[in-house]
């Protein structure tokens, strides 16, 4: 059955609050047993819309939703820094099944207008970021919590106030042929955040954003119970951002496993592939990480990466003198058939108390370019700086590895192309690595 939002009071005039009309159409569709809620061409002003089970929200070509969301405090949440409201969204749902957002329309979060102050001229933690958000942004512009059989397909997603799509505790999710356009200098405008979800397929997405493009996390504290993030598959995507093209870990204590990424192009990202195991009992934003995620059984194949840094793997404590041990891990991770153009060396770092497990690299070509200083030539700091390393020139080796059990490089190569200054011809430097098989050829052009 088809339910036209304009028949329920929605007005395509870009000013009238059409939330009641949209919600009435969604509720009527659900009450009838499900179907399609149709959004005809035109501009609609919308506040928070909650989808129901068995409802597809379909945008006809020329249809556009523009956000009316405002900062709303999340009850019981205290934070010292600007943070987000995890219980508000523009379009989403909680504990629903068989729901979808589809069509050739546009969804505009108006993050710049509604949630960001003027350019303050400072450089914030992310590469090139110039804006710092207000408190209480909706964390996910499109958000689904503890739901199953969810689809988001074909729509153009613009200017989110925080994450563009956030799925937490969901099963059977498909994100297909999405176009994401978020301000490259905006704060925390991740594109696709997959958090404690299983059986997720991401394909054909074209992304530009001001934080991570694809982030796989396991924030069981936010979810409220232990649930792994597993069986995540991303392919045939184009990524551009001011942080990480693909990020695994950081927020969360749950397992991240059986994740696969293939046939992806990254163009001008800060870090190509980031993996992070951290503990942070309270970082001031409400994020609680007690022991760190266990990241295992993941593969990266046939990726083209243009990045400031190709790989950055970290084990971190916040604060650095936190007495609790890191018990999370990275193990059984495979990188195969990768081509990387990078302007500083990659960091593969465990911690003295918790080493990286097995990393396997096969047929990985790392091209290094640009002028390299001597900031880290004599001494690489520990902990290695994460977001604030931009003031230094970086690592002069293609790979720097410390505190790891087993690293294997098969048929890999390093090409120094228009690489000046203090680049080292030695392709890898290791510290406290139990085993390193380094079949890495080096060529200078």
Task: Kindly label every feature range from the protein language model.
Residues 1-445:
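Extracellular/periplasmic carbohydrate-active domains that bind, remodel
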